[in-house]
Amino acid sequence: MARYTGPRDKVSRRFGVALFGSTKALEKRPFPPGQHGMRAGRKKKSDYGVMLAEKQKLRFQYGVLEGQFRKYYAEAARRRGITGDILLQLLELRLDNVVYRLGFSNTRAGARQLVSHGHITVNGKKTNIASYSCRPGDVIAVGGKASSQQLVTRFLDLTQATVVPDWLECDRDKLTGKIARVPSKEEIAPIVNEQLIVEFYSR
């Protein structure tokens, strides 16, 4: 399955929540897109439909393909602890998401491009894999090229009001960040019910 590149507001309207940051689309049209959107919004979903929607919301939020998402769930289920919480942590520690959380980009899609185009380093080494799993102690930095630094500096102007979460350390002047620790579920503040995703895969 290819990565979704269509209108993001339509996806947010489909699920009734802003998946990609604030949007006025939900205020103007608080119902699913399409010819029968208003009627579809009033339909009661089956239990399966509710669980599927939660999975899709989380997948779209982080820009993860279906196959990748299944692998994240399998890894979360394999580890000791609360599966839903671990799933959220695995997604949150993706390199593209960390770049986004640091404010080096104003969207996850933009952060993914920064990584894939070689603008980001991890512990001093260029890393162009958006799904790279960061660990506590990892130092994330913008590459030394002037073009990389100018690009991220422009993004920082757009994200000045962004609050960097406590599990990250950020030096905006040096364009660097560090993973201080693994984030808690409360810090991630998911917009989904992750337990329903666990139930979806446990059927």
From Swiss-Prot:
Keywords for the protein's UniProt record, in alphabetical order: Ribonucleoprotein, Ribosomal protein, RNA-binding, rRNA-binding
Domain S4 RNA-binding: 93-158
Cellular component GO terms, alphabetical: small ribosomal subunit
Signal sequence coordinates: none
SMART domains per record: Ribosomal_S4, S4
A biological process from GO: translation
MF annotations from Gene Ontology: rRNA binding; structural constituent of ribosome
SUPFAM superfamilies: Alpha-L RNA-binding motif
A Pfam match: S4
Job of this protein: One of the primary rRNA binding proteins, it binds directly to 16S rRNA where it nucleates assembly of the body of the 30S subunit. With S5 and S12 plays an important role in translational accuracy.
Family recorded in the similarity comment: Belongs to the universal ribosomal protein uS4 family.
Oligomeric form and interacting partners: Part of the 30S ribosomal subunit. Contacts protein S5. The interaction surface between S4 and S5 is involved in control of translational fidelity.
NCBIfam families, per the entry: PRK05327.1, rpsD_bact
Name of the protein described by the UniProt record: Small ribosomal subunit protein uS4
Organism: Akkermansia muciniphila (strain ATCC BAA-835 / DSM 22959 / JCM 33894 / BCRC 81048 / CCUG 64013 / CIP 107961 / Muc)
Lineage, highest ranks first: Bacteria, Pseudomonadati, Verrucomicrobiota, Verrucomicrobiia, Verrucomicrobiales
Designated gene of the protein: rpsD
